[in-house]
Swiss-Prot record:
This DNA polymerase requires a protein as a primer. It comes from the Viruses. Heterodimer with the terminal protein; this heterodimer binds to bp 9 to 18 of the genome. Forms a complex with viral pTP, DBP and hosts NFIA and POU2F1/OCT1 for initiation of replication. Belongs to the DNA polymerase type-B family. The gene is POL. It comes from Human adenovirus A serotype 12. The keyword Membrane does not apply. Its EC number is 2.7.7.7. Keywords: DNA replication, DNA-binding, DNA-directed DNA polymerase, Host nucleus, Nucleotidyltransferase, Transferase, Viral DNA replication. It catalyses: DNA(n) + a 2'-deoxyribonucleoside 5'-triphosphate = DNA(n+1) + diphosphate. This is DNA polymerase. Eukaryotic-type DNA polymerase involved in viral genomic replication. DNA synthesis is protein primed, and acts in a strand displacement replication. Assembles in complex with viral pTP, DBP, host NFIA and host POU2F1/OCT1 on viral origin of replication. The polymerase covalently transfers dCMP onto pTP, thereby initiating complementary strand synthesis.
């Protein structure tokens, strides 16, 4: 027998078989992964046996003659099939099915292939992870609320702010407060005489305050972690014997977390402990000043803890600085019943770990206002008076300050005379003989801490009650401090409401609301356009000006329909695009924003404006093509827009062409995603107004305004980690080239804890210390004594040499080094934010302003711009400054949009139409009627002044308004801004400027001279002058108009391809 056949065959046996038969041609079709097939061919020179196969070795045993016809094999794994016939087939580009002549592929299969199989588009849209809004009902919490006072010190990096006083207040669960209080006493903290749970540290030594606070925080989290570990051991006494038998360990603290995961039958009820470090506006100041002393997680905690850290700086502030000490949770399992999640609750099985979390939270990020205003908004008592911090600063810098005979600081240290007299009167009422500057500073700081602690408790209880009562989530156990900002909390509430309504029965929000990712993330972000802000009049205007403002513009826009459902696959998308193109080519008919035959989507377009006499000063769209955002009436090329913008442009007379782009996204339908969320907040606000509940009103207003911003959150590929936090997974990514270390920087060593060793003295011979001559480039001086060497007196034969002190820092290099890691893949991975919702929110706001422009300018169509009357002079994102003529048109043409005449705020799906309303912002302070400014001056965007407000109803005059972004407004007046404009207009060489103190915050930076974890004080001087680099065109000496095809944007140098018919 020459060859034996079996059921399975590997490649070597197949090749051996072919070599025996020696056909004229042998084809081997091999099935690979993902449906691919490779072909290999063996050709023989002579079928009668005179030649050898191309890939065959010489063999003595051969058949007398070869086979004179080709033979084909199909290899699938170890199965080999003989192919009788091969026929060419085609592959459907939409569903990947193979067919001979024709086939029918279902929509479901096309969608599945587009979203899950196609290697190019399968990662374009990702499901959004969901976890209920609530916290575990048994969570134990401890709050350390603190404030710090600083003085100015001239350091190596400029005027740095050095803490000299820190006051902290303990609150939370009684057992944790008792534990923390005992530790504070043990570590020698001073107890404030007026409150037993308030402690302070007071010393001018440069690093002492930070070191003492660091020691306390470290000892506290160490003791809490140890307590959690001891509870874990009490519930699992068998671990000691197991550790000794399996790992040979006597002390369980020597186990690692990975060892502990392998332990048998871990049991016991899990514990969840949270330690919050809280202050007001600390993330942009106090936590940076103290950060180098307190950021430490290499503690004396038991080894089995899994320690992770979330450190995220953003815009010069610490957004996250959280440390988690985790142990396994024996009750954790995959959830199958999601009813509790729908009501915002969670329990033991939802947490992979039991933990101690140490979190830094800033109440400013939850209130967006000063401490005093926040206290008023949440109905908290606030003590009168304030502290003369300028005097305190001078006292610590110079050792004294200017005072009267009783030691009370002079008027120069106070904001104004009124503040000086008030505080002097308050002090005299105390009956003290001499003014104690530091004692008063301590009292004011402690009172601020008590107010902040009251604010913390008020925020906790008020938000929990709001989520329970207004949102209807009675199982949530909501904790507002679980998330760091009001934006993240608003987004969590929105997602919870959506999850409750949709009931997806899974751990994400379902397939109908997805997050754009990779190529689609950048494409969707390109459709997000900023707000409108520019004057169309520069100079002094001596005629009435009224300011109208859209009421809750983003909230109203959020109630409108948003895209819903997974994006259409290319086949259905092409059909939907065709419907849009047909509608857009009907130039004589306007398109309804809510036409059910037209699907929502994001497109790439070219657009050409109508005749310039049909345009106005409020263009429907803006472009970044020139490098700066400009609202323009020029032709648009290659712009990414939403379907709402298509309707707005078309209805304003623009000619649009949809460009072929594989990233074009069409959604199957519309849905009012955020309408319920906005309605809840509006209802809560109205109820608060009726009940005069200032706290509820503040919460509802903040949550209503914050949601849009969360949709527009911009992600990047960067991650900042401390060197000691470089986990093995990160190291592998760096080694593989998927992550790059973009920059590394070190914390300023002066802010770290240090120990200075006593100086050493040794006697050396002068000859031993002689400086050896060296090359010029190696020495800064030609000749001189040795380093650290002072020449001895002439009659002395030896020299006493004193070393410079040796400094030992209480930190390792990993604690001091910050790495900024950046992915080598420029594409963003997004599974958190449905960014396209932000695109449509902004598109709806552009539709609002487009309708507004119709009220004002529709009657001017066909009249050249230079011949039209002045109706509006300034446009902000949600407001418009109109003249008397513009106001009359608002009262007539736009009456249904004025709130006092019944204008609506919330979109009604049963009667779909644009829904927005305005109200006059310039109102009389005496009678509340609409008022106007008789004279105004406009210098630039966000730089204008209204002289005063006159009321036509009661005839009274009230204070005007000044807007000067970036300037110290207290130094500005209407007369000064008027002089500035007139000086520029008349060619004078006078320069105007304002100055204010500014804090430069550095957390992690690769810039030279910018050192991590420093706050330096600088004087910021800004020039006050009319608009120079305008993004509009002058129509005359005062009036401006947007760019147009006759007067294009000179910055736009982009080359585009245009085919002329």
């Amino acid at each position: 027998m020459l060859f034996s056949l079996t059921d399975t065959m590997d490649s070597s046996r197949l090749y051996a078989l072919i070599s025996r038969f020696r056909p004229s041609r042998a084809e081997i079709w091999t099935c690979r992964s993902r449906g691919t097939v490779t072909l290999s061919v063996l050709a023989f020179e002579d079928p009668n046996g005179s030649g050898n196969a191309a890939e065959e070795e010489e063999d003595e045993r051969q058949l007398p003659s070869g086979i004179d016809f080709p033979i084909c094999f199909l290899v699938r794994g170890r199965q080999v099939h003989l192919i009788q016939q091969i026929q060419p087939v085609q592959r459907c580009e939409h569903c990947a099915r193979f067919y001979k002549h024709q086939h029918e592929c279902s929509v479901r299969r096309r969608d599945f292939y587009f979203h899950h199989i196609n290697s190019h588009s399968s990662n374009w849209w990702q499901e959004i992870h969901f976890f209920p809004i609530g916290s575990h009902p048994r969570t134990e919490r401890l709050f350390i609320t603190y404030d710090v006072e600083t003085y100015t010190w001239m350091g190596a990096f400029g005027k740095q702010l050095v803490p000299f006083m820190l006051v902290m207040k303990l609150s939370g669960d009684d057992n944790l407060v008792k534990h923390a209080l005992q530790l504070a006493l043990e570590l020698g903290w001073d107890q404030w005489e007026k409150d037993s749970t308030t402690f302070y540290c007071l010393t001018p030594e440069k690093m002492k305050v930070g070191q003492q606070f660091r020691t306390y925080r470290n000892r506290l989290q160490t003791s809490l972690a140890t307590d959690l570990w001891m509870t874990f051991l009490q519930k699992n006494p068998h671990l000691s014997q197991w550790a000794q038998e399996e790992n040979g360990l006597v002390a369980l603290e020597d186990l690692s977390y990975e060892d502990l995961k392998r332990a048998p039958a871990i049991k016991g009820e899990p514990r969840f402990v949270e330690l919050y470090i809280v202050g007001h506006n600390i993330n942009g100041f106090d936590e940076i000043v103290l950060a180098a002393q307190v950021i430490n997680n290499r503690l004396d905690v038991p080894g089995p803890f899994k320690i992770s850290r979330n450190f995220i700086p953003r815009a010069g502030k610490i957004l996250f600085n959280d440390i988690t000490f985790a142990l396994p949770n024996p009750h954790y399992k995959k959830r199958t019943n999601f009813l509790l999640w729908e009501h915002g609750g969670c329990d033991d099985q939802d947490f992979k770990y039991q933990y101690l979390k140490v979190m830094v939270r800033d109440t400013f990020a939850l209130t967006h206002t000063s401490l005093r205003k926040a206290a008023q908004a949440y109905a908290l008592p606030v003590e009168k008076g304030c502290c003369p911090y300028k005097a305190v600063n001078q006292f610590y810098m110079l050792g004294s300050y200017r005072a009267d005979a009783n030691g009370f600081p002079l008027e120069e240290y106070w904001k104004d005379k009124e503040e000086y007299l008030l505080n002097q009167e308050l002090w005299k009422k105390k009956g003290e003989k001499n003014y104690n500057l530091i004692g008063e500073t301590l009292n004011y700081c402690a009172l601020d801490v008590l107010v902040t602690a009251s604010l913390v408790e008020k925020l906790r209880s008020s938000y929990a009650q709001f989520v329970t009562d207004a949102v209807g989530l009675d199982a949530a156990h909501f904790n507002v401090f679980q998330r760091p900002t009001i934006s993240s909390n608003s987004h969590a509430i929105f997602r919870q409401i959506l999850y409750r309504a949709e009931k997806p029965q899974r751990t994400h929000l379902g397939p109908n609301i997805l997050a754009p990712s990779h190529e689609l993330y950048d494409y969707v972000r390109a459709s997000i356009r900023g707000g409108r802000c520019y004057p169309t009049y520069i100079g002094v205007l001596k005629e009435p000006i009224y300011v109208y403002d859209i009421c809750g513009m983003y909230a109203s826009a959020l109630t409108h329909p948003m895209p819903w459902g997974p994006p259409l696959n290319p086949y259905e998308r092409a059909l939907a695009v065709r419907q849009w193109q047909v509608a857009l080519e009907n130039y004589t008919c306007k398109i309804d924003y809510f036409d059910k035959n037209l699907c929502p989507g994001i497109f790439t377009i070219d657009a050409d404006p109508p005749d310039e006499n049909q345009l106005d000063v409020l263009p429907p769209f803006c472009s970044r093509k020139g490098g700066r955002l400009a609202w323009t009436n020029e032709s648009l090329r290659g712009e990414v827009v939403t379907s709402v913008d298509l309707v707005t442009l078309h209805n304003r007379g623009w000619r649009l062409r949809l460009l072929s782009d594989e990233r074009t996204t069409i959604f199957p339908t519309w849905k009012c995603l955020a309408r319920e969320y906005v309605q809840l907040n509006i209802a809560a606000k109205e109820r608060a107004d009726r009940d005069k509940n200032q706290t509820l009103r503040s919460i509802a207003k903040l949550l209503s305004n914050a949601l849009y911003g969360s949709f527009a959150t911009k992600l990047d590929n960067k991650k900042i980690v401390f060197s000691d936090q470089m986990e093995e997974s990160l190291m592998k990514e760096i080694a593989a080239g998927r992550l790059n270390i973009k920059s590394s920087s070190f914390i300023e060593t002066d802010t770290l804890s240090t120990e200075v060793m006593p100086a050493f003295e040794r006697v050396y011979s002068p000859n031993q210390l002689a400086l050896v001559n060296s090359e010029a480039e190696e020495s800064d001086e030609d000749q001189g004594p040795a380093p650290f060497y002072s020449p001895p007196p002439e009659n002395c034969e030896h020299v006493t040499y004193t070393y410079k002190p040796i400094t030992f820092m209480d930190a390792e290099e990993g604690d001091m080094c910050l790495h900024t890691l950046e992915s080598s893949n420029p594409l963003i991975n997004n599974d958190r934010y449905p960014s396209h919702v932000a695109s449509f929110v902004l598109a709806w706001t552009r539709a609002f302003v487009s309708e507004w422009s119709e009220f004002l300018y529709e009657e001017d169509r066909g009249i050249p711009l230079k011949d039209r009357p002045l109706k509006s002079v300034y446009g902000d994102t949600d407001s418009l400054f109109v003249t008397e003529k513009g106001r009359r048109l608002m009262e007539s043409q736009g009456k249904k949009r004025i709130k006092k005449y019944g204008g609506k705020l919330v979109f009604d799906p049963s009667c779909p139409e644009l829904t927005w309303s305005v109200e006059c912002e310039t109102v009389c302070s005496y009678c509340g009627a609409d008022a106007y400014s008789p004279e105004s001056v406009f210098l630039a965007p966000k730089l204008y002044a209204l002289k005063c407000l006159q009321c036509p109803h009661c005839g009274s005059t009230s204070k005007g308004k000044i807007r000067a972004k970036g300037h110290a407004t207290e130094a500005l007046s209407y007369d000064l801004m008027l002089k500035c404009y007139l000086a520029e207009a008349q060619g004078e060489d006078t320069r105007f400027s304002t100055s204010r103190l500014s804090l430069k915050r550095t957390l992690a930076s690769a810039q030279p001279g910018a050192h991590p974890f420093t706050v330096t004080e600088t004087t910021l001087t800004r020039t006050l002058r009319p608009w120079k680099d305008k993004t509009l065109v002058h129509l005359d000496a005062h009036r401006l108009v947007p760019y147009s095809n006759s007067q294009p944007n000179p910055r736009n140098e982009e080359v585009c391809w245009i085919e002329m018919a």
